[in-house]
Amino acid sequence: PSKPISLNLMINDEIEYRFINSGHVLGGAMLELWITKPNNSKIHLVYSSDMGSNHNNQFQYYVPPRDQVSKCNYFISEGTYNNSERSWTKKQAIEEREELKSEIKNYLCSGKEILFSAFSFGRLQNIICMLYDFYGKEEWFKDIPVIIDGVLLHKINSDYLNVLEGEEKEHFQRVLNWSNLKCNKDYTGT
C-alpha cells in the first residue's frame, strides 16, 4: 500500500501499462493500458475488478484510496452492484459503526454469541481490526474470545504482515497479538 504502484512500464514501442490502486482491498489494482496504433494515435484502456468507494475508504483498514483514472477510450469492469444505489455519507457510516458497536455489546452482555461470516481476505481483517479498536481496551471484554477459523486466513494474515509497513504493520501486529484473538490454524478438531 505504501509502495508506489503507479509506475509506467513499456512492453514494447506500442504498449505501455501501469497498475494503480483500486481502493478495494490491500494490494487491489486496476490496469491501465496505452496502445499505440500504426497511425501513432493511442487507445487508453482501463481494466478493473472491484473498486472501492472513496467515501468508505477511511473505514477499511490498510487499503489505500482509489487512484483516479484519466479519461480513457474503454473501461472494463465487473458489475457487482451495477446501477444500484450504494451511497452514504461519512456521518451515516460513523453512525452505522457506533450502532454495530452497541449491538455487539448488548448481545455479548446478555450472554449471546455472535458469528461473523467473512471472506478470509479483506473482510476478516477489517472485522478483527474493528473489534480490536472497539473493545481491545474494554475491561468487560477481556475474557471474551474472538475465534477466527481457517487455514487460509493464517497465510493471508502473514502476508499482510509482510506487506504492511510502519504504523499499519504495528497496529495489525497488535491485533494479531490480542489475547482475545484465537486462531484455528488447521482443521484438527473442527
Give the predicted meaning of each segment.
Residues 99-190:
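Hard-cation-handling environments
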Residues 1-126, 132-140:
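His/Asp/Glu-rich metal-coordinating catalytic cores
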